[in-house]
Amino acid sequence: MLKRSLLFLTVLLLLFSFSSITNEVSASSSFDKGKYKKGDDASYFEPTGPYLMVNVTGVDSKGNELLSPHYVEFPIKPGTTLTKEKIEYYVEWALDATAYKEFRVVELDPSAKIEVTYYDKNKKKEETKSFPITEKGFVVPDLSEHIKNPGFNLITKVVIEKK
């Protein structure tokens, strides 16, 4: 009887220990490591290739600061079009990272633009390109011959309101 109980407990213990290992393996394999590269910190992953960095300050219609979320980086692909609607969508995601589903974007600052700075190998100098945010949008240029991970930066104030 004692041998049977010990055998049963051993089998039960082994089942529980292996189930925790397989859950960790399946969780780690579902993360697409191809889109991100590991930074200095083990918990930080930087996008590989072009990315849109959204760094905004949420203000009310009178200009009072309501929210200042951390910047968020979104992978983007050369050749895709970034319209005003898509950019507002990314901004709302950045707001949700700090205050989930609390605020909605009313409008972007009219002077808001997206900028990318890189070293132009042909001109042998640093270049900054600016792209206005419009309904029609702009096509993300392929800068792979100049820089590996070009960061397209949106740093602006955004009029927001509570949902």
Swiss-Prot record:
Q: Which UniProt keywords apply?
A: Plasminogen activation, Secreted, Signal
Query: Which InterPro entries does the UniProt record give?
Result: SAK, SAK/SK_sf
The record's Pfam families line, in alphabetical order, gives:
Staphylokinase
Recorded hits in Gene3D superfamilies, A to Z, give: 3.10.20.130
A single GO cellular-component term on record: extracellular region
Q: Where is the signal peptide?
A: 1-27
Where does the protein end up? Secreted
Q: Which family does it belong to?
A: Belongs to the staphylokinase family.
**Reported function:** Potent plasminogen activator that converts plasminogen into plasmin. It forms a 1:1 complex with plasmin, which in turn activates other plasminogen molecules.
From the Swiss-Prot or TrEMBL record, give the protein name: Staphylokinase
